[in-house]
Amino acid sequence: MKKTLLVITGTLLCVSCTTRPPLPLGETSKVSTDGRPIIPVTFVFTTNSPEATKFDNYQQMRKEIKILNKYYVDDKNNKIFKFKLHRYIPYEEFSKLHCDLKQQINQPYPITIETIPASVNTCFPKRTASKEVIVFIYDAYSTKWKFEDVTSRAFRNNGKPFILLDWNRLNYNIQAGSVHEMGHVFGLKHVCAPKATKRTPTNIMASAECKLGSGGLRNLGFTPVQLQTILSTYKQYP
């Protein structure tokens, strides 16, 4: 199990294995029945780490969607989007892709942030739904922590957003990983939480980056200003 450390995630503007096939493609309505904008989410499982493979299944991806829908809220606990499972690509399918993303991530050396978007765009040159966000589940590596690292990142990628989510942050583990990174996808930056400890309730986008305290629990919803940024960024995506 990886170390539970406080992770500073980055954004770029550059801010048991299953054989189940990807979910069938189809037109996705842009608005749910309750009026919330729909965000199609594609999960791509890119690691065959023995510890991670138990999460490489359709049921886990459904669970991750439920987590996003439950915790991606404003400070009055109002839901903002309707996240919907669009596609799921298991490791078995990912491993057959003919692109260099496999050499860019899950390797015993740090990723090169500047080259990741180009590799992703080569593997997935076209998005299959409006506003689609791709979440790549991977095994983070750093010189200091080796594969114990859990750093996750979000890239807005010129209108083709994606997330690198360390597998150990599935199940809402370690500072609301997927929810925090989805905040970056929709334009948000880190905020400071002075004197916060690991158990302090904090804003979803809180970070230890400012050196004034821990990022805390990241369990408090988005402020009105943050919500405005989220909705504005949503409108900018094709």
What is each of the regions a protein language model found here?
Residues V15-S16:
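C-terminal motif of bacterial Sec signal peptides marking the signal peptidase cleavage site
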Residues S32-R36, C123-K131, R153-N158, K195-R199:
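Extracellular/periplasmic catalytic domains that process cell-envelope and extracellular macromolecules
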Residues A140-G159:
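Catalytic zinc-binding patch centered on the HExxH motif and its immediate surroundings
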Residues N48-D56, K76, T143-F147, L212-N219:
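Short, solvent-exposed loop/turn elements at domain surfaces
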Residues M1-T4:
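Positively charged n-region of N-terminal signal peptides that target proteins for export
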Residues P161-P238:
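The catalytic-center signature of Zn2+-dependent metalloproteases
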Residues V44-N48, Y88, F136-Y141, D166-R169, ...:
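Active-site-proximal beta-strand/loop segments in catalytic clefts of secreted hydrolases
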